[in-house]
Amino acid sequence: MKNRILVVDDEEGIRLLYKEELEEEGYEVALASSGEAALERLDESNIDLVLLDIKMPGIDGVEVLRRIKERWKTLPVVLCTAYPHYKQEFGTWASEAYIVKSSDLRELKEKIREILNR
């Protein structure tokens, strides 16, 4: 059975890039364009890992992370953001990993593999 990854990002180009790259790695990928949509998707689906942007309109990624950890305590979350300074923010510490967005997705793919193989 394929692992299911939920990609949460307000930028469509990022969502589609991650979807294509992760499907090539053999994962099943679901998409959400907002924090609200991500929480709805988690209610409806079995997800094995969440890739979560931090800076989004509406509910930001740090708040989504907090809500995920309240309801789905063991669900791994990888924060993916273009802003490296968020790593120092206390609210991000609950994530399994913190990745700065890059066009090179090797680090992200390696981290996903590592987390899902625990």
State the predicted function of each range.
Residues 2, 46-48, 72-76:
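His-Asp phosphorelay/catalytic-motif detector in bacterial-type signaling
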Residues 16-24:
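Charged docking surfaces used in two-component/phosphorelay signaling
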Residues 40, 62-73:
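Short amphipathic alpha-helix used as the core "switch/output" element in two-component signaling
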Residues 53:
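Active-site residues of response regulator receiver
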